[in-house]
Amino acid sequence: MAASVWFVLAILLVALTFDFINGFHDAANSIATVVSTRVLSPTAAVIWAAFWNFVAAFVFGTAIAKTIGKGLIDLSVVDSTVVLGGLLGAIIWDLVTWWLGLPTSSSHALIGGYAGAAVAKAGFSAIIASGWTKTLVFIVVAPVMGFTLALLLTVALSWALRRSLPRRVDKTFRVLQLVSAAAYSLGHGTNDAQKTMGIIVALLVSSQALMVNFPIQAFHLTDANHIPTWVILAAHAAIGLGTLSGGWRIVKTMGQRITKLTPFGGFAAETSGAITLFIASHFGIPVSTTHTITGAITGVGAANRISAVRWGVAQRIVWAWVLTIPASAGIGGLSYLLLRAVV
């Protein structure tokens, strides 16, 4: 039993490692616009983003964590091996796409890997179909919402400031972009850290038969509706530290290769992305921060002129999105089968 308890604790560390990699992989989402507009240096930008990633722990609730913890996969199917297989599926896919410089979704890699491992164990009956509906719908809705809000905000602000001096506008939005970058990092922190919280809660609830005699009471969890404070703080700390580590390959794709940005455009993109993430977090919908900010950046470019968007780069990114859930599910399922054979 002792060995099994330590196995569960090791998986908990793997979950926090995924959260760290999530911050590392998705750092570009939070800082690409503010770096590409030269409002902040890369070093200052990652510190700014990481700080607000952690502050999000004290601002938002845990609706997304509950969706992940009990709303996507039948908890009666979940065990420590399923959770580990799912995490490995997500981590491997994240690292491959990071190496290739593709801003794919860590969020969808996680739920894909988790689902793949559960299906490998119990078949498709492990899937809670109702819980997947809003998640799959928002694969499309989140970037479209980001795109639409950014386009409308860019057009509205351009009209309102049409008689202002360009230099004054640039100076004003350099300051405002610090606020919009902080808001987006808050949204990124709460939406993505909560996904790891949900996985940790699913792990602890499904492992209570093993953990009941563990001396630390904080690890005793029988209700997936309760998210312990230490889980919230650990998840936000891990994603914040990951953001501090950066992710410069993807920054270039996100901030410069989709469309050229000014502080004005960066503000519009980040504000639109933040609003989208806040709405999704309020309703407990796990969305992709990558999809959201990419849609917003594209919306800013399209508002200026359609040719300002490098659609070839955007198309390559879309293909990475389409592949993420099935690819990570396949890796997660294979990881589960391999783990079951050796553990």
Label for each model-derived stretch:
Residues M1-V343:
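Multi-pass alpha-helical transmembrane bundle typical of ion/small-solute transporters
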